[in-house]
Curated annotation (Swiss-Prot):
Similarity section: Belongs to the bacterial ribosomal protein bL28 family.
Entry protein name: Large ribosomal subunit protein bL28
Entry superkingdom: Bacteria
Glycoprotein as UniProt keyword: no
One Pfam short name: Ribosomal_L28
Species, as recorded: Caldanaerobacter subterraneus subsp. tengcongensis (strain DSM 15242 / JCM 11007 / NBRC 100824 / MB4)
GO biological process terms held by the UniProt record: translation
Length: 62
């Protein structure tokens, strides 16, 4: 599972509880996009979460 290259956000594990309170392991996955960005004047493909994209932490290459 990819992680965000900016903030390091990745998937987390937890339990899903049924009505009878039985639990099974489930995963929460971040909204990660592959983005072409400009890093040190070169075009690089990064895995970036949607929160970092909205915050403007990545300068996208057009």
């Amino acid at each position: 599972m990819p992680k965000c290259d900016i903030c390091g956000k990745g998937s987390i594990r937890g339990f899903q509880y049924s009505h009878s309170n039985r639990r099974t392991i489930r995963r929460w996955k971040p909204n990660i996009r592959k983005v072409r960005a400009i890093v040190d004047g070169t075009h690089v493909t990064l895995n970036v979460c949607a929160k970092c994209l909205k915050a403007g932490k990545v300068q996208r290459a057009l």
